[in-house]
Regions:
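An N-terminal-biased, well-structured beta-alpha scaffold segment characteristic
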Residues: 1-90
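Residue in the alpha/beta-hydrolase core beta-strand immediately N-terminal to the catalytic nucleophile
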Residues: 68, 144-146
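Phosphate-binding beta-alpha-beta segment of Rossmann-like dinucleotide-binding domains, i.e.
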Residues: 85, 93-144
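Glycine-rich Rossmann-fold phosphate-binding loop(s) that bind the pyrophosphate
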Residues: 150-151
Length: 152
């Protein structure tokens, strides 16, 4: 079996890059723009998607076999055009669920403690200005927090 022609819209983790290079001719877009993707993805059989894919890529690439979203959503892939062309569309749902959950907790704490304002004042006006915020931050103790999830 001949090597696959694999194109990625972005640089990926070194271990992933090594694995993909081991199974095919692996190329990366010079920029994650529609123009660069359209110009540089020629001949790709598999495209790893982290930037919007122009529908023209699907229309042009007769040998395109798969568009694989490096993430949970499919919003960057013109799914209808891919389906019509017989191109497999895949993603990795739930892959970042823990990271998103941690980010929600961090953001809630940052807002409770007024982190954005404190950080700005510390950087722009020094310790005394940042210290003044200590009277306005709230404690998490004895509070109820509700988190509503949408998805995995």
């Amino acid at each position: 079996m001949a090597d696959l022609s694999i194109f990625s819209t972005h640089h990926l983790h070194p271990e992933v890059t090594e694995a993909l290079s081991g199974i095919g001719d692996y190329r990366v877009a010079s920029a994650p723009t529609p123009e660069a993707i359209l110009a540089e993805s020629s001949g790709a059989e598999v495209i790893v998607v982290r930037a919007p894919i122009p529908v023209e890529v699907i229309e042009r690439e007769q040998g395109l076999k798969a568009l694989v979203r490096h993430g949970a959503g499919l919003d960057m892939i013109p799914v209808d055009a891919a389906t019509q062309a017989g191109v497999l569309v895949a993603n990795v749902p739930g892959v970042n669920a823990l990271t998103v959950a941690e980010h929600v907790i961090w953001t809630a704490l940052a807002l409770l403690k007024r982190y954005p304002e404190v950080n700005t004042d510390l950087r722009e006006r020094g310790w005394a200005a940042g210290r003044a915020h200590s009277d306005f931050g709230r404690e998490l103790s004895r509070r109820t927090i509700g988190i509503v999830g949408m998805g995995n």
